[in-house]
Amino acid sequence: MDEVGTQERIRIFDTTLRDGEQAPGISLDPLEKLEIAEQLARLGVDIIEAGFPVASQGDFDAVRQIARQVHGPVICGLSRTHVADIERCYEAVRDAEHHRIHVFISTSPSHLEHMLRMSEDQVVEAVRRAIARARELVDDVEFSPQDATRTPLPFLYRVLQVAVDEGASTLNIPDTVGYGIPWDFARMVESVRREVAGSYVISCHCHNDLGLATANSLAAVAAGARQVECCINGIGERAGNAALEEVVMGLAIRSDVIGDVTTGIDTRELARTSRLVSRLTGYPVQYNKAVVGRNAFAHESGIHQHGVLTDRSTYEVIDAASVGQEAAQIVLGKHSGRHAFQEALARMGIALEGDALNATFQRFKELADRKVELSEADLEAIVAEELGTTLADRFELVSFRVEAGTGREAVASATVLVDGTPVEASASGNGMVDALGRVLAEATALEARLTGFSVTSVTGGADALGSVAVTVDVGGHEVSGRGVSTDIVEASARALLNALNRAARVREKASNRETP
């Protein structure tokens, strides 16, 4: 059992790049994963679960790149109990300053019967072999019994004890289907600490199917867990995971109830990290999202406004500045030069050089001609868009035109460079965005269907940048795209073409893998 009294530091295990990326429609490129990982390091997370290396060559390459280039956090890879998977996972994380192998297997009766078709004894033996092999490769091994909250406790204790005996130093209790209730989940954590002997850290991994992921995570910490697994913005499969920003601020604000605990998170980076993940994944942050939502510190009721104007603590338990939610500072205008632009990015923790810097600066100058002042949020949107178009794009938008009116179909025409050759196309659709999607699909010769569309204002004002996020189904594979502009129609065209370029890269990678 871990000695809670000597481990008051709560480890924050971020799984945005693994469990978070499993959300439908999210498909991150290696450079986007690296950018998120670098921001997570600036945020101060303890462990980054960078991916599932055996899932694909692309996932393996992304994990290995993060292991080699991101410094500070432990870089972790997920693995099944198969020895070959564990060895593949090790190859992906081995170059990290600090690395971990995270081994999992299902343990609930439902999963054993319908998924694994294994007996309890067979699962125990698989865990024994897997942890022993992982421990031969690395010093830091984590074990997760998937669907733990629906696993009979005697069998759960048995599996966890075997994992500890073979060398696992972290035992994770996953509420895989969001079944847990805070007080019941806390009792489970307490019982594991009591019944499983040895030296280890207890971790929790809570899903949000009942809207209780954050509450369950905080209850687990109060019961003795010293690691929390979570995702930025709470993204993930189905209803998502525990939101990192909520867990961290819950621990900070209610230490009087939870216990005298701390994390290594620089909370001033929370809002920026949230915006970055939102833009790169194409998943918007709901306006009323706790901590990082647009309305998290907004007040409309007259009584509330009066109280906040007198003393913000009357209706706010979090200082907006402490989580990076203060008003974005105006930093640049159309007369700003390349050096000032690069310095502004550096102050934001963004380092660009070479072609990436040139492309981003050129896009900045284009938008600065239309917008009087650009804020940090504007710059973040520009960088996010341009970094998504630097990976050898096949398609480049030259020009487009859309005509629409009441009672008739929208008609669009466009010129697109396809591998450097101009291609002209025209199409009609049910509205301007649908027509744009159809004409760009025709120009690129991809069978594409728009499945999701959202638009948000990056900043306020009549000249505000609009950020458009789309999801597009291309041959049964869903990809996301984004675009920014002061013109929403142009932002939509950029987002659609960004998605089509991603789809083309996915096809090219698949073709290369099939070639001997």
Curated annotation (Swiss-Prot):
Which residue stretches belong to region Regulatory domain?
396-516
- According to its UniProt record, which reaction does this protein catalyse? 3-methyl-2-oxobutanoate + acetyl-CoA + H2O = (2S)-2-isopropylmalate + CoA + H(+)
> What keywords appear on the UniProt entry?
Amino-acid biosynthesis, Branched-chain amino acid biosynthesis, Cytoplasm, Leucine biosynthesis, Manganese, Metal-binding, Transferase
Q: What pathway is this protein a component of?
A: Amino-acid biosynthesis; L-leucine biosynthesis; L-leucine from 3-methyl-2-oxobutanoate: step 1/4
The segment(s) forming the Pyruvate carboxyltransferase domain are: 10-271
Instruction: List the cofactors.
Output: Mn(2+)
Give the binding site residues for Mn(2+). Answer: D19, H205, H207, N241
**Could you tell me the Gene Ontology terms of the biological process aspect for this record?**
L-leucine biosynthetic process
Which GO MF terms does the UniProt record name? 2-isopropylmalate synthase activity; acetyl-CoA C-acetyltransferase activity; manganese ion binding
What protein name does the entry list?
2-isopropylmalate synthase
Classification from the root reads: Bacteria, Bacillati, Actinomycetota, Acidimicrobiia, Acidimicrobiales
* Gene that encodes it: leuA
